[in-house]
């Protein structure tokens, strides 16, 4: 893991080049959150990818522990079920929300706009959908398709977990589930949209 220390921001930017096991990531975040809450460690933003897994949020109910031998992890984040794996960029935040007036809605709003602006740089028109969390765009068939997901949790005044952006991942894993609990939904990736001109 590479640490890019931005002293003036008081935030550590962590970059992992290898796939990070989900158990390790959760353990790391929970320890870091505890230290941030105590003022021992700086806030952090972590860029990584996971091996192929499914994760479920607090509002998802299932007794299964795998889907086609891909493990399912029950998490404490918001949301339902989604897939993570190679080709999907994960960005985990460990941010003291107390310093930001405990405004979680504003934090989510800023994250969503950040993703939309980044995709716009790639000439991908992305947008939010009413009453749904995440970022959407049109897939190659003109369907509304999710390209980025968000799931957050707060502990001791520190927000953690984060967002995922589909860059060049296999979309077949999403077809085995109702992504984020939305039936008959479509999922896409940056590569899927741009492959004809890349």
Annotate each language-model stretch with its function.
Residues 1-144, 154:
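N-terminal lobe of the biotin/lipoate ligase/transferase fold
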Residues 148:
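A translation/RNA-centric and nucleic-acid-associated enzymatic feature enriched
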Residues 54-55, 157, 172-173:
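Short, acidic Gly/Pro/Ser/Thr-rich loop/turn segments
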Residues 101-104, 161, 174, 198:
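Short, conserved charged micro-motifs
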Residues 168-198:
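A hydrophobic, small-residue-rich beta->alpha segment in the mid-to-C-terminal subdomain
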Residues 158-171:
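Conserved phosphate/anionic-ligand binding catalytic regions in large, soluble enzymes, centered on
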Residues 94, 151, 164-166:
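Residue-level recognition of well-ordered beta-strand positions that form the cores
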């Amino acid at each position: 893991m590479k640490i890019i220390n931005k002293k003036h921001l008081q935030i550590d930017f962590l970059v992992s080049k290898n796939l990070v096991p989900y158990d390790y990531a959760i353990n790391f975040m929970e320890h870091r959150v505890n230290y941030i809450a105590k003022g021992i460690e700086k806030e952090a933003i972590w860029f990584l990818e996971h091996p192929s897994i499914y994760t479920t949020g607090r509002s998802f109910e299932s007794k299964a522990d795998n889907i086609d031998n891909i493990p399912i992890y029950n998490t404490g984040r918001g949301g339902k079920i989604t897939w993570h794996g190679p080709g999907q960029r994960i960005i985990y935040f460990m941010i003291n929300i107390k310093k930001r007036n405990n405004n979680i809605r504003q934090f989510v709003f800023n994250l969503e706009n950040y993703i939309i602006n980044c995709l716009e740089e790639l000439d991908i028109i992305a947008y939010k959908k009413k009453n749904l969390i995440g970022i959407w765009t049109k897939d190659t068939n003109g369907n509304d398709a999710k390209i980025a997901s968000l799931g957050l949790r707060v502990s001791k005044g520190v927000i953690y977990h984060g967002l995922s952006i589909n860059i060049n991942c296999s979309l077949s894993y999403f077809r085995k589930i109702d992504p984020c609990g939305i039936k008959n939904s479509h999922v896409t990736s940056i590569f899927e949209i741009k492959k004809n001109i890349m």
